[in-house]
From Swiss-Prot:
GO cellular-component term (any): cytosol
Protein name: Transcription antitermination protein NusB
Protein's gene: nusB
Family: Belongs to the NusB family.
UniProt biased composition (Polar residues): 175-188
Role this protein plays: Involved in transcription antitermination. Required for transcription of ribosomal RNA (rRNA) genes. Binds specifically to the boxA antiterminator sequence of the ribosomal RNA (rrn) operons.
CDD domains, sorted: Terminator_NusB
Annotated region (Disordered), positions in chain: 152-211
Sorted UniProt keywords: RNA-binding, Transcription, Transcription antitermination, Transcription regulation
Protein source organism: Chloroherpeton thalassium (strain ATCC 35110 / GB-78)
Length: 211
């Protein structure tokens, strides 16, 4: 069975939800929620426990970020699902180097749409976006590999207008430069991309006038 990262995040959210409600040890809670086929998948198991442990070990710092950007909302008044989705996303931002921050935010929003109220996705998006902008401006994001995907490069690089490897030509799509035409006319014109020499005027043939 192939399990997606979104499904792993959903399971992590369920574990954290039950952990908060039941007040039991996280290992016991996780054992009753995470399916055996996920535990048998080394990559899936590693990712889900990275998320869960990152949240639990850093929950005070994570909750501080949430509370800072939640206008007039106390943590204990927030929906438990929303709160744990935000905890997961912030944990990924700060402690999982290989996850792009915007992916973490988007995943939390989409899962909120499925499991929580109609207004939850906007609420989650607002707090996570504000948190992301804050930690990015302070330079506390430490990403590597795939985690660098949506972060700005240190130096702006200008794309080469003449790349060494041209893009693959789509099939069955006519080349706009193969047979150029004048606008609103079927008369072909000279291809401006063909050859390096400037067009030469036609040579006139001189004839002697008869006396």
């Amino acid at each position: 069975m192939i399990i997606s990262r979104r499904q792993i995040r959903e399971l992590a959210m369920q574990v954290l939800y039950a952990y908060e409600v039941r007040k039991e040890k996280v290992d016991k809670v996780a054992k009753g929620i995470i399916p055996e086929d996920v535990v048998a998948d080394i990559k899936a198991k590693d990712f889900i426990f990275k998320i869960i442990n990152s949240v639990i070990q850093n929950i005070q710092d994570i909750d501080t970020h949430i509370a800072k950007h939640a206008d007039n909302w106390e943590l204990n008044r927030m929906a438990i699902i929303d709160k744990n989705l935000m905890r997961i996303a912030i944990a990924e931002m700060l402690y999982l180097d290989d996850v792009p921050p915007k992916v973490s935010i988007n995943e939390a929003i989409e899962i909120a749409k499925r499991y929580s109220t109609d207004k939850s996705s906007k609420f989650v998006n607002g707090i996570l976006d504000a948190t992301y902008n804050e930690v990015k401006s302070k330079g506390v994001l430490h990403k590597s590999g795939r985690g660098l995907v949506d972060l700005p490069a240190k130096k702006e690089r200008v794309a080469n207008p003449f790349p060494s490897t041209p893009p693959k030509k789509p099939e069955n799509v006519p080349n706009p430069f193969s047979t150029p035409f004048k606008k609103n006319s079927s008369e072909p014109i000279r291809n401006p991309f063909e050859g390096n020499k400037s067009p030469q005027p036609p040579q006139k043939t001189l004839r002697r006038k008869k006396k």
